[in-house]
Design a protein with these regions (language model features):
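Conserved nucleotide-sensing/catalytic segment adjacent to the nucleotide-binding pocket
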Residues: 18-21, 27-76
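Conserved catalytic segments around the Walker B and adjacent sensor/switch elements
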Residues: 13-21, 119
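ATP-dependent NMP and nucleoside kinases share a basic, alpha-helical "lid"
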Residues: 76-135
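Short glycine-/polar-rich loops that comprise or flank the Walker A/P-loop
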Residues: 15, 112-116, 166-169
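Glycine-rich phosphate-binding P-loop
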Residues: 1-8
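Short helix-capping segments at alpha-helix termini
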Residues: 10-15, 139-141
Length: 177
């Protein structure tokens, strides 16, 4: 992922950096099933946005303590708490996720907590769709299930995300993904 490469480059330049993905704040599958939203996992309202905002506030206010964050594991489609350590010495915190610019469901509280926001736009939607299908297949879905998921859930997310790109400080257009 680009966020990991940016953190690696920063560290190579002597800047302590950490990547904080919003994916750790996916609601648990059992909770998504209880809420009836499991079939749309990844939509803005299927995350613990309050927990994510709280994490960002804690990081910004951090003086000396370590702030712990959950990490999402795609191979089991669940998050594990307190797996990522954000330390006070981290000078660069790269926050990564698809809903950082969203303006509803509580996500509007995220943008003011970011010093800068970049939007990465893949100009080849067919390539992006194909990569998403392959990712879903690699994590256990059948090709048919992967295509259905991408054409319903993922494409709806992509449209929702694209509608907020104007909020980004910089938009990077990527010819290939």
């Amino acid at each position: 992922m680009l966020s990991g490469r940016l953190a690696q480059a920063a560290r190579a330049a002597g800047i302590s950096a950490v990547v904080v993905p919003m994916d750790g704040f996916h609601l648990a599958n059992t909770e998504l099933q209880r809420l009836g939203t499991a079939e749309r996992k990844g939509a803005p309202d299927t995350f613990d946005v309050d927990g994510f905002v709280n994490l960002l506030q804690r990081i910004r206010a951090q003086a000396t303590a370590t702030v712990w964050a959950p990490v999402f594991h795609r191979e089991v489609e669940e998050s594990f708490a307190a797996e990522l350590a954000i330390k006070a010495h981290h000078r660069l915190v790269i926050v990564e996720g698809i809903h950082l610019l969203h303006t509803a469901h509580g996500w509007e509280r995220v943008f003011p907590l970011l010093d800068v926001a970049w939007y990465l736009e893949c100009l080849d939607v067919d390539q992006q769709r194909a990569r998403l299908v392959q990712r879903h297949i690699a994590h256990g879905r059948t090709p048919k299930q992967a295509h259905v998921w991408v054409n319903t859930v993922d494409m709806a997310n992509m449209e929702r995300i694209a509608a907020t790109k104007h909020r980004a400080h910089t938009i990077f257009e990527l010819a290939t993904w």
